[in-house]
């Protein structure tokens, strides 16, 4: 009964989020930042925030990202817990079936500061490309989850790590470069909160960043890695593990036969 109530609450929250995003995007057309986000940034993060300069800078960045097309919408606006998450670097896939990616005002403020940086190492812009690729991979692999307990958590972990590989590939970055950017821009600034995130398997459907970066060492989502993630989530059901491998394991690339 409690599980059914939780499902209903989640569906209601998703519906409310969809309504909010629909209204926000309708108000702003193809704009990339909500008025609420602008107000939050000026009040909490950067009083000198210049919206027009920000738009110009972001559009230049987006033109360099080849996996986005003319139908993709990048939208900076508060979401989820408005009191805690807005200054951090968080993202969400937005509406299922649409190429909308939602980012917190913290992203807008950090990228805005980058537009003034003369000798930047590009860590934040590379991380931005990786995160967009990660969220876009989520959209491509989207499927409803009708599971509970550890199996639901396990699928959450598999989705995140699979989308990490997708983000690395789409952004044309190495796992080493993404790791450097994460450690500088997120773990270095928000490490205490992020390092607690998902360390207890049953609490969160996300693994820790440390766990995710460890998985990247395989270079791709192998069947062995999928099986190990399942085991780390406490899954003993071998049929379930085999099913997850069929869904999430990348097929090895066959070498081309020599001509002649």
PLM features: residue spans?
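Membrane-interface motif at the C-terminal end of an N-terminal transmembrane signal
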Residues: 14-31
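Auxiliary, metal-adjacent structural segments of Zn-dependent hydrolase domains
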Residues: 46-108, 125
């Amino acid at each position: 009964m409690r599980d059914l109530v939780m499902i209903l609450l989640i569906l209601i929250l998703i519906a409310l989020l969809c309504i909010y995003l629909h209204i926000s995007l309708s108000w702003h057309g193809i704009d990339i930042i909500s008025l609420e986000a602008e107000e939050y940034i000026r009040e909490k993060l950067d009083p000198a925030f210049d919206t027009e300069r920000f738009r110009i800078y972001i559009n230049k960045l987006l033109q360099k990202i080849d996996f986005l097309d003319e139908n993709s919408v990048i939208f900076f606006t508060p979401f989820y817990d408005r009191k805690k998450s807005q200054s951090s670097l968080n993202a969400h896939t937005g509406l299922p079936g649409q190429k909308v990616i939602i980012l917190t005002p913290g992203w807008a403020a950090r990228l805005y500061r980058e537009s003034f940086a003369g000798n930047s190492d590009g860590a934040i812009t590379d991380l931005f490309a990786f995160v967009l690729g990660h969220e876009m991979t989520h959209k491509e692999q989207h499927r409803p989850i009708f599971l509970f307990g550890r199996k639901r958590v396990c699928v959450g972990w598999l989705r995140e790590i699979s989308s990490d590989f997708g983000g690395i590939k789409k952004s044309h970055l190495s796992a080493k470069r993404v790791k450097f950017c994460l450690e500088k821009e997120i773990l270095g600034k928000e490490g205490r909160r992020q390092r607690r995130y998902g360390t207890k398997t049953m609490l969160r459907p996300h693994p820790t960043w440390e766990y995710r970066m460890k998985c990247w060492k395989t270079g791709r989502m192998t069947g062995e890695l999928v099986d190990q993630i399942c085991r780390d989530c406490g899954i003993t059901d071998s049929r379930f593990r085999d099913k997850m491998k069929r869904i999430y394991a990348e097929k090895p690339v066959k070498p081309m036969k020599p001509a002649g």
